[in-house]
């Protein structure tokens, strides 16, 4: 359990509210302060006992805490860090929940004192958004990557580890650039592929075609319903790595296209077989059975 006497959650959407709920459910006894832009979000968070204090000013929330968690889209997190920097107490650690780390760590180095920021990325979420979609179990058993820049002290990273462990997550350490290369393949490429698939299927007469869409369509395009602001930030701040993964994906699609055009159906069958084997290996690596979410 984290020993932080006070934690500030800057942003009470899906990720931030779920973090507060997870900490409370698992016995965190310290003070939880939060910032949210909308008055109705602040009121609901207080009424449900999700946080102890809900502010309309991020400085006020951050000033109460020894650990601050930025739960906003990546570029908005940079702006929020600049806002709260003057209010931070000595010894306060700042972390985040964003899906890219290299660009963010570089930006934070110009805003916060050395050793204050430790990036983190809980590999959990939903295409749903907002406080209403939050769950105390969102982080349960999920992997959170703690991606500290070289200037970050190990003690600060350990405090971020403890935060996510207290929320029910497993943690691992990675360099920010290594994190971005891996997540470009496992998260960012799948999102672009889902978006492209939804766009291609709905290109003409979407209303008429929709009646014929089954579970395969919904399963393979679900994430395309996610936050546009969040995903635009992710792709913009990890563009080279995502582009490299798209190149590999494009080669696979083009090969199947060529084989279909040429009538090489044996090659198509081998492609499908290799794809199934690859998926099974990926699921083993994550420790999940087929069909598990």
Where are the predicted features?
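NAD(P)+-binding Rossmann beta1-loop-alpha1 motif at the extreme N-terminus of oxidoreductases
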Residues: 1-63, 67
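Residues at the starts of beta-strands that form the adenosine-phosphate
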Residues: 6, 31, 116, 143, ...
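Rossmann-like NAD(P)(H) cofactor-binding subdomain of soluble oxidoreductases
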Residues: 80-134
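Interdomain hinge/lid region at the active-site interface
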Residues: 207-275
């Amino acid at each position: 359990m984290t020993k932080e006497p006070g934690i500030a959650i800057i942003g009470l959407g899906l990720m931030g509210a779920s973090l507060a709920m997870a900490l409370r459910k698992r016995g965190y006894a310290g003070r939880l302060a939060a910032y949210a832009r909308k008055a109705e979000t602040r009121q609901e968070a207080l009424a449900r006992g999700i946080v102890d204090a809900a502010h309309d000013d991020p400085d006020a929330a951050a000033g109460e805490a020894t650990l601050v968690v930025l739960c906003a889209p990546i570029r908005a997190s940079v702006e929020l860090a600049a806002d709260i920097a003057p209010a931070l107490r000595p010894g306060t650690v700042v972390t985040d929940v964003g899906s890219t780390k290299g660009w963010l760590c570089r930006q934070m180095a110009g805003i916060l004192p050395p050793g204050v920021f430790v990036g983190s990325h809980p590999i959990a979420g939903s295409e749903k958004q907002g406080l209403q979609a939050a769950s105390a179990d969102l982080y349960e058993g999920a992997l959170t990557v703690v991606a500290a820049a070289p200037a970050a002290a190990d003690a600060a990273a350990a405090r971020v580890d403890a935060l996510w462990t207290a929320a029910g997550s497993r943690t691992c350490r990675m360099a920010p650039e290594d994190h971005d290369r891996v997540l470009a393949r496992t998260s960012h490429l799948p999102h672009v592929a889902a978006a492209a698939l939804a766009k291609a299927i709905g290109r003409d007469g979407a209303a008429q075609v929709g009646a014929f869409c089954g579970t395969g369509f919904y399963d393979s395009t679900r994430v395309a319903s996610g936050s546009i602001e969040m995903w635009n930030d992710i792709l913009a701040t990890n563009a080279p790595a995502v582009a490299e993964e798209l190149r590999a994906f494009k080669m696979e699609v083009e090969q199947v296209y060529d084989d279909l055009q040429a009538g090489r159906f044996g090659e198509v069958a081998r492609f499908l077989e290799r794809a199934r084997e690859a998926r099974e290996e990926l699921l083993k690596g994550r420790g999940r059975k087929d069909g598990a979410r």
